[in-house]
Curated annotation (Swiss-Prot):
The lineage of its organism: Eukaryota, Metazoa, Chordata, Craniata, Vertebrata. Residues 1-17 form the signal peptide. This is FXYD domain-containing ion transport regulator 6. Belongs to the FXYD family. GO terms for cellular component: glutamatergic synapse; postsynaptic membrane; presynaptic membrane. Keywords: Cell membrane, Ion transport, Membrane, Potassium, Potassium transport, Signal, Sodium, Sodium transport, Sodium/potassium transport, Transmembrane, Transmembrane helix, Transport. Its main location: membrane. It comes from Mus musculus. Regulatory subunit of the sodium/potassium-transporting ATPase which is composed of a catalytic alpha subunit, a non-catalytic beta subunit and an additional regulatory subunit. The regulatory subunit, a member of the FXYD protein family, modulates the enzymatic activity in a tissue- and isoform-specific way by changing affinities of the Na+/K+-ATPase toward Na(+), K(+) or ATP. One of its GO terms (biological process) is regulation of monoatomic ion transport. Residues 58-94 are cytoplasmic. Associates with and regulates the activity of the sodium/potassium-transporting ATPase (NKA) which catalyzes the hydrolysis of ATP coupled with the exchange of Na(+) and K(+) ions across the plasma membrane. Reduces the apparent affinity for intracellular Na(+) with no change in the apparent affinity for extracellular K(+). In addition to modulating NKA kinetics, may also function as a regulator of NKA localization to the plasma membrane.
Length: 94
């Protein structure tokens, strides 16, 4: 009798584990919302920081005694190129 009781007690975790696996199989779309939220916030902070660094590196050269930019800098050259391309008449293709 004792051996039957020992065998049944050894089989109980197996039966419970298989029941837990069946329960997990019923819900295939389980999301860990806490991890998803933290990952999204970390991703947003990284993108925000990269954006701020790009803006500051483009505009500020970290020097207070720096001369103002000359009118012939690269941004002005790009604007002039755009306006000259827009002013040229487009040729009709026949």
């Amino acid at each position: 009798m004792e051996t039957v009781l020992v065998l049944c007690s050894l089989l109980a975790p197996v039966v419970l584990a298989s029941a837990a696996e069946k329960e997990k199989e019923k819900d295939p779309f389980y999301y860990d919302y806490q991890t998803l939220r933290i990952g999204g916030l970390v991703f947003a902070v990284v993108l925000f920081s990269v954006g701020i660094l790009l803006i500051l590196s483009r505009r500020c050269k970290c020097s207070f005694n720096q001369k103002p930019r000359a009118p012939g800098d690269e941004e002005a050259q790009v604007e002039n190129l755009i306006t000259t391309n827009a002013a040229e008449p487009q040729k009709a293709e026949n």
